[in-house]
């Protein structure tokens, strides 16, 4: 598959000692082409899975109470934004690798990963760079501002218009752009930090997001782990200012976050670093699957809306887990 040209090249080797080689190759090419087109994308339900199938670390009323408490902290000047999350847990009887396959089909994302840690598995489809370092260049790509996908193209476009005209979402995103600039500014050469993409909309299977791109050139002798240390945790999953936001998260969230909002990536022998923010990520352990999702709380937040945002973000993983529980011949 050619990602640049967005096309597939099919190559068949012909045997030169057979008179029918040309016809055989054409037949095989047709067979492969038919296989490529055989599986149509699944129709993805936009409805929430049956709530009786999963439990939450936050009852809905408790989550909304935590949102109101966070807004009190914001009104008192403690903090500008806090990202509150809930963890959803349900039974999982399938194979973890089938969960990865289902997620790859239903919610393809820039970062796809399957980590088998023997007694548990981590499976994810993260849309967001935590931080990337290549040669002397570093990138952070804040994602903030969310709407569910529309059922029709017209509804989808209307959701995008609503998202880009929502003062609350825009203010939240601008705050996180500034935080990203500040994070990489600590390890970048003076004058090198720039905003290369500003407030574009990216679409995924169940949600769309506002996304921006911030780049800088690192100070000489800066190591990859210095870069990770300067940018972790991401403001998009903690808040601003970070330390006070994390204190409030520790107070209000009923469970420690674990892998959620951490980092998954690699450090190469050449010193390059590429890390995904571990959101849209599931942990499977002891026949249970755990999915966590958050929402950025600001002064204008509506508790019910923020709860719905966490559910929308968890949707792709919950639906993929349902598919992975089915016999694979039914896919």
Tell me what each language-model feature is:
Residues 1-331:
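Extended alpha-helical targeting/anchoring segments
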